[in-house]
């Protein structure tokens, strides 16, 4: 439940898996019910330091770190790598054959393609992103697919836009607070996909959001109203603390 809260039902949804893992440990440590049952949480000081200092939080960087440090030196790092590799394998098995996108996703991409350059910004491993977008024949709509190995979402936008686009002509579409922060860090606009109401959000983007963006009437009250609604879907307090 702590993992689901962090990754799906809180303002931290969409963050990189390693900070999310650490946050889950911290929430469990403060939760009386599981602690009363004698749960033993792993001691991960090296992983904490790495997650705070590494700029490309992904398996390639973690593999390089583990190659330079033995399992006796850094047992938590080697365990984290084993876990992360297993996560990738599990995801590949779960989505084998392809999970179709929400209704109106493809329609939005087709509508925007004629007027915009589009790319993927994600903290999912790049290999999984490329495979899943290709399985749905949606990679043809974007000029690049950026995963966790490339850097943060803010860096993805910065790398692609610096010196190329006016900031008022950049729109980040996302379902997490990290997506909103990435947009704001680059003075870009943001269209929220509300968690749990994805289909309605994509329909709104198709029906009105894209038209407003391309017409130059998106910024201001319209965007602010969408973000105010979006933030209500992202609590900071887990349900067991209420």
Residue ranges and their predicted role:
Residues 96-117, 124-242:
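C-terminal cap/substrate-recognition subdomain and adjoining C-terminal extension
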């Amino acid at each position: 439940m702590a993992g689901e809260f962090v990754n799906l039902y809180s303002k931290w949804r969409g963050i990189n898996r390693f900070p999310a893992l650490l946050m889950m440990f911290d929430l469990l440590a403060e939760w009386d019910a599981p602690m009363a049952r004698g749960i033993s949480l792993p001691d991960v000081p090296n992983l904490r330091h790495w997650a705070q200092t590494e700029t490309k939080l992904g398996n390639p960087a973690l593999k390089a770190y583990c190659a330079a440090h033995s399992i006796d030196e850094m047992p938590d790092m080697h365990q984290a790598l084993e876990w992360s590799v297993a996560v990738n394998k599990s995801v590949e098995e779960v989505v084998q054959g392809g999970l179709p996108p929400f209704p109106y996703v493809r329609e939005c991409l087709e509508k925007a393609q004629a007027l915009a350059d589009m790319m993927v910004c994600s903290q999912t491993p790049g290999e999984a992103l490329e495979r899943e977008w290709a399985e749905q024949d949606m990679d043809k709509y974007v000029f690049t697919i950026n995963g966790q190995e490339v850097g943060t979402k803010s860096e993805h936008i910065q790398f692609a836009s610096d010196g190329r686009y006016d900031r008022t002509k950049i729109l980040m579409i996302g379902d997490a607070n990290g997506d909103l922060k990435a947009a704001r860090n680059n003075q870009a606009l943001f269209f929220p996909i509300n968690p749990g109401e994805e289909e309605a959000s994509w329909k709104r983007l198709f029906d009105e959001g894209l038209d407003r963006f391309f017409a130059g009437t998106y910024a201001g009250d319209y965007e602010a109203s969408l973000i105010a609604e979006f933030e209500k879907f992202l609590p900071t307090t887990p349900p067991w603390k209420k």
